[in-house]
Amino acid sequence: MNMSSAFLPCLRLSALFALLFGLSVAVAAPVVPPPINALWDRDTVLAEATFADQPEPNTLRFVDVRVVHGGDARSEVTVRADDDALRMAKPGTRYVLAWQETQASPATKKRRVMRPDGPQLLMSPGVSPALLEARPDTRELLLQAPSAERLDGQAHLRRSLAGLRSDDPQMQSLFAAELFARSSLRQQLGWTERRRLRAFVLRRDRAVAARSLVLEAALIFPTQFGDDWSPVAARLLAREPVSSAPAQANEGLLWTAFGILQRDGTRVPIKHLTRWIACGNGALSELALHAIRRQAPERELPLIEQALAAPTLATGTREFLLEHRRRLLRMRERRD
């Protein structure tokens, strides 16, 4: 699964536990760099190069390398990469890429040591993986060192909002992460920009990773993104496709939608929650059941029974619902 960032699983889990145990959702802002800054981190090598081939499984070899930042000049480099990067790389294509040759020492996190498996393609919010086609606008944006003059003003805000309309899913995610992580951009958001962001999250023809980042920003930064996202969250639960697979591409988007509704105390039609009970993702199913319990506790058990009666119910979902029903009945016995 293509995660939009390395911090998102921890962020979602913290919000998830708050939701499941009926706590108010107040998620601390994660400390993550804007993607352009991440490319220029002191432990990152930034370069432009041409993809050649895959010499070994999960590796990419680049030639005609031009190192821009962080490393010594070289003619070629081989980096370890995830499945997404392996699918994306096209022989003969010129790329902007970033990798890390060191990692935190197992003995002490304050020291850096060489990676035993060799250079690793960077994975960071908005550049996950850090492998983008070297088009003129991409080179101009990424191969210049970050500066407040270039990236903190209205021009970069306009560029980021326009980038969400790109046909390239990677650029959508990069600019969504810029809006998420660059505080100077968040502070400039007005009514018009917020309206455009709400519309973007609802567009199913946009990259789900980018939509998830914007919605999570709305959950974490309500002062800058506004407190009127509940209608967006409710529409997502009503319209997003339901899958019987355990891993759903839109699961992060939906977790955050549940988080916003819980934060704002918003009630939604039960039928919009019911459609998630029988999905293949246990966390989403449980979030839906807890939302139903908050609104109409008397309907939770009948809806579980209804889902269990479906012959097409996925095995994993059936096991989860049986266990959830057992816990629910035990909880009711204790109350009685």
Identify the role of each PLM range.
Residues 29-43:
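Short boundary/loop segments of OB/S1/cold-shock single-stranded nucleic-acid-binding domains
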Residues 42-65:
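Structural detector for short beta-strands of small beta-barrel domains
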Residues 2-15:
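Bacterial N-terminal signal peptides that target proteins for export
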Residues 164-170, 202-209, 239-252, 278-283, ...:
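Short coil turns that connect the paired helices of HEAT/ARM alpha-solenoid repeats
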Residues 152-162, 186-201, 224-243, 266-277, ...:
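Amphipathic alpha-helical scaffolding segments comprising HEAT/armadillo-like alpha-solenoid repeats
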Residues 140-150, 173-187, 209-224, 248-266, ...:
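Structural detector for internal amphipathic alpha-helices that build alpha-solenoid repeat scaffolds
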Residues 12-24:
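Bacterial N-terminal signal peptides
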Residues 80-166, 170-171:
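Extracellular C-terminal loop/segment signatures of secreted glycoproteins
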